[in-house]
Amino acid sequence: MKNKILFIDRDGTLIDEPINTFQVDSINKLVFKKYVISSLRKLVELDYKLIMITNQDGLGTESFPLQDFSTAHLFMLSVFRSEGVIFDDILICPHFLDDDCVCRKPKIKMIEPWLDKIDLKKSYVIGDRDTDMQLSNNLKIKGIKYKEDICNWLHITKYIIKHNRYAEIIRRTKETKVSIKVWLDLEETSKIDTGVKFFDHMLEQLSVHSGICMNISVQGDLDIDDHHTIEDTGIVLGEALLQALGKKNGLSRFGFYLPMDESRSNCIMDISNRPYLNFKAKFNHKMAGDLSTNMVEHFFYSLCYSMKITLHLYAEGKNDHHCIESLFKVFGRTLRQAIKIEGNMLPTSKGIL
C-alpha cells in the first residue's frame, strides 16, 4: 500500500542549527522550532508517516562524538514521543561531503526501503537547505523549504492539509456550469454563489457544521427555474466529497446526530458505497426565500447518489426556513463525524469500500 510520507530534515527544520559549530552535541543546544510539535501531531492524526533524514557531518569521529550526539538526539525524540509524535524511520548519514558516500542527501540510497511505499502525489520533503529540495526532485515528490518567517511549521501544515483530502470538479451541461472545490480538513470561510440566495445560506450552514471548506460557483438556467441549479450542485458536491475522501482508510464511516430546537431533525449516515436516501420532511409553502422547497429532498438525493452514501434524514417543524436549515445543519454535523480519520484500517470486513 502506498503511504503519505513526510521526509523531514532535522537541524534547521525540526530544531535550531547552531550557527557556529552546526552540531547539536548537548541538550543545552537543543531548541525546537516554533509550532513543530503541534504541527507534526496534527499531520500524524491525518495518517502521514514521518521519516527523519539528516546529514550529520563526521558523526562518530573525534570532532563529533557519537555519545554527544546521541544524548541530545534521544532527548529530542523523547520530547516528540511524549506529545504523540513518533518517527517511522530515522535515516542518518555520518559522512563528510568530501567522502563522496552513497548515502548523503540529496542521494536516495538511505530511502531505498521506502521507495515502493511512497504516495508520490501526497508525500513531501521538508527542509531548510537546497539539498532537501534536490532530494525532493530525486524522489519526484514536492519539496517544501522551511523558512522561519514566511514558511514555518504553521504555514507548512496548512499547505499540506489544504492539499490532503481535497478535490476540484467542474461540470458543464447545457443547463448549468458547476465548479466546486472542497477541503475536508481545512476550516476556513467558504465562498458560495449558486444564484439562489437561500440555497447559498443553506450550503454555508452545511460547510460550517461539517468543518469542510467549500468553494462553490454555479451558473444555471434560473430564468426557467431552480431545478437544474440545485440538482447539479448536489451531484457535483457529492462527487467532490467522494473524490476528496480518497481510499477511505481510517475513515470513521458512520455518523448520527439528533439536535433538538424549534425544528426537530435527525440524521444517520453510512459512507457505504451503496447510495440510498430515506427523507422525511414536510413544508408548508412552495418557496423558502428564492428556493423551491420541493428541491430540498432532490438536492440530498442528488448528493447522496453521487457521493454513494446511505442517508436517513428527517425533520419536522412549523417554520419552513428553520426546518430546512435544521436539515442542512444536522447533515453537516453528521458528515463531520463520518469523515473523521481514526487509525489506518479500512472500516469494512469486505476489504473494499
UniProtKB/Swiss-Prot annotation:
Keyword terms of this UniProt record: Amino-acid biosynthesis, Cytoplasm, Histidine biosynthesis, Hydrolase, Lyase, Magnesium, Metal-binding, Multifunctional enzyme, Zinc
One function term, GO molecular function aspect: histidinol-phosphatase activity
Associated pathway: Amino-acid biosynthesis; L-histidine biosynthesis; L-histidine from 5-phospho-alpha-D-ribose 1-diphosphate: step 6/9; Amino-acid biosynthesis; L-histidine biosynthesis; L-histidine from 5-phospho-alpha-D-ribose 1-diphosphate: step 8/9
Pfam families cross-referenced by the UniProt entry: IGPD (PF00475), PNK3P (PF08645)
Record NCBIfam families: HAD-SF-IIIA, hisB_Nterm, Histidinol-ppas, PRK00951.2-1, PRK00951.2-4, PRK05446.1
Region annotation (Histidinol-phosphatase) ranges: 1-164
Active-site residues per Swiss-Prot or TrEMBL entry: 9 (nucleophile), 11 (proton donor)
SUPFAM superfamilies xrefs: HAD-like, Ribosomal protein S5 domain 2-like
Keyword match Coiled coil: no
Binding site for Mg(2+): 9, 11, 128
Natural source organism: Buchnera aphidicola subsp. Acyrthosiphon pisum (strain APS)
One GO cellular component term: cytoplasm
Recorded catalytic activity of this chain's protein: D-erythro-1-(imidazol-4-yl)glycerol 3-phosphate = 3-(imidazol-4-yl)-2-oxopropyl phosphate + H2O; L-histidinol phosphate + H2O = L-histidinol + phosphate
Chain intervals for the UniProt region annotation (Imidazoleglycerol-phosphate dehydratase): 165-353
Named cofactor requirement(s): Mg(2+); Zn(2+)
Signal peptide start and end residues: none
Chief place of localization: cytoplasm
Protein name: Histidine biosynthesis bifunctional protein HisB
PANTHER family reported for this sequence: IMIDAZOLEGLYCEROL-PHOSPHATE DEHYDRATASE (PTHR23133:SF2), IMIDAZOLEGLYCEROL-PHOSPHATE DEHYDRATASE HIS7 (PTHR23133)
Enzyme Commission code: 3.1.3.15, 4.2.1.19
GO biological process: L-histidine biosynthetic process
Subcellular location: Cytoplasm
Classification via InterPro entries: HAD-like_sf, HAD-SF_hydro_IIIA, HAD_sf, His_synth_bifunc_HisB, HisB_N, Histidinol-phos, IGPD_sf, ImidazoleglycerolP_deHydtase
CDD domains named in the record: IGPD
